[in-house]
């Protein structure tokens, strides 16, 4: 049984990746019985993340009506740090957005003895509400779970029940605060066994988000080559050198890799903001770009 296995190696690398991200910006219901990975159709990459814009939630509509910045909060683990970096890079030139890093490394929905994610999200929202919440967890959760004196194996029925309850509570909290919610899935992993566990995680969360009516942003098709295999480089662009997309650990991405994953989501967010502006009609001017 994969019961309470230590993901120390992943977490340690996450710390290094987080430091790299910071330095980069300073410088510039069913039981899933099997944890087997499914291979995406190569053509799925073009559509991954590029879906129709979602209708604006109450806080987003209010932000537009009031002419204030749209506050986006990214919650997650060390991979969430990278999602924040990619989304920040995509939206930073638009003065109408503020993208906040609210992720915590070494966390997950199986690790509530280290950090209760619901309590952490609530405390952060109490300090500074968000209009849009982007969630990405899972790299630390391919292990058993311990709850109320009992341990349960990864992807067992009780594991799924407990994680579903915890995730549902977090999504419910965000919605009661008026925020739009997105869930970002994980990309393909280099090591086959870990990848099988991660793709089982992706299927689990995709089903949970569908049940909660939360948009699920798929990143798997953007992280493979034409054969559906792990791709360490970004797709080649005419006249440009290929750029590395994955970190050396085979788990995390490089900054260009995270930016690549977030193109679709940033477009969807812009689309929702455009809808909110159209619904609001003439009103306060958009936030001006800050100097410097």
Residue locations for each model-derived region?
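N-terminal secretory targeting modules
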Residues: 1-73, 272-292
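Catalytic His-Asp segment of secreted/periplasmic serine-dependent ester chemistry enzymes
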Residues: 2, 15, 19, 25, ...
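Stable alpha-helical elements in mature extracytoplasmic
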Residues: 79, 83, 87, 117, ...
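Sec-exported extracytoplasmic/periplasmic mature domains
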Residues: 80, 88, 92, 96, ...
């Amino acid at each position: 049984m994969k019961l309470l296995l230590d993901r120390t190696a992943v977490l340690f690398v996450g710390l290094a990746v987080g430091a790299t991200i910071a330095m980069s910006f300073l410088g510039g219901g069913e039981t899933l019985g099997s944890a087997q990975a499914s291979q995406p159709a190569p053509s799925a990459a073009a559509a991954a993340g590029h879906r129709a814009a979602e209708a604006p939630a109450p806080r987003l509509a209010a932000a537009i009506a009031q002419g204030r910045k749209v506050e986006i909060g990214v919650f997650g683990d060390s991979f969430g740090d990278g999602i924040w970096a990619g989304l920040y890079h995509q939206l930073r030139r638009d003065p109408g957005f503020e993208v906040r890093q609210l992720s915590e490394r070494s966390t997950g929905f199986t690790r509530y003895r280290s950090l209760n994610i619901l309590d952490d999200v609530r405390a952060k929202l109490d300090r500074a509400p968000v209009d849009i919440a982007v969630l990405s967890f899972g790299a630390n959760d391919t292990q058993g779970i311990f709850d109320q004196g009992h341990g349960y194996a990864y992807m067992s029925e009780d594991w799924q029940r407990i994680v579903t309850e915890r995730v549902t509570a977090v999504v419910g909290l965000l919605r009661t605060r008026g925020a739009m919610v997105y869930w970002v899935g994980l990309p393909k992993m280099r090591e086959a066994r870990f990848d099988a566990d991660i793709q089982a995680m992706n299927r689990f969360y995709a089903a949970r988000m569908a049940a909660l009516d939360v948009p699920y942003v798929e990143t798997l098709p953007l992280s493979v080559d034409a054969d559906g295999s792990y791709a360490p480089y970004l797709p080649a662009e005419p006249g440009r050198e290929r750029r590395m997309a994955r970190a050396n650990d085979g788990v995390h991405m490089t900054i260009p890799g995270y930016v690549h994953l977030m193109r679709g989501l940033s477009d969807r967010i812009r689309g929702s903001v455009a809808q909110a502006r159209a619904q609001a009609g003439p009103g306060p001017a958009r936030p001006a770009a800050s100097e410097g």
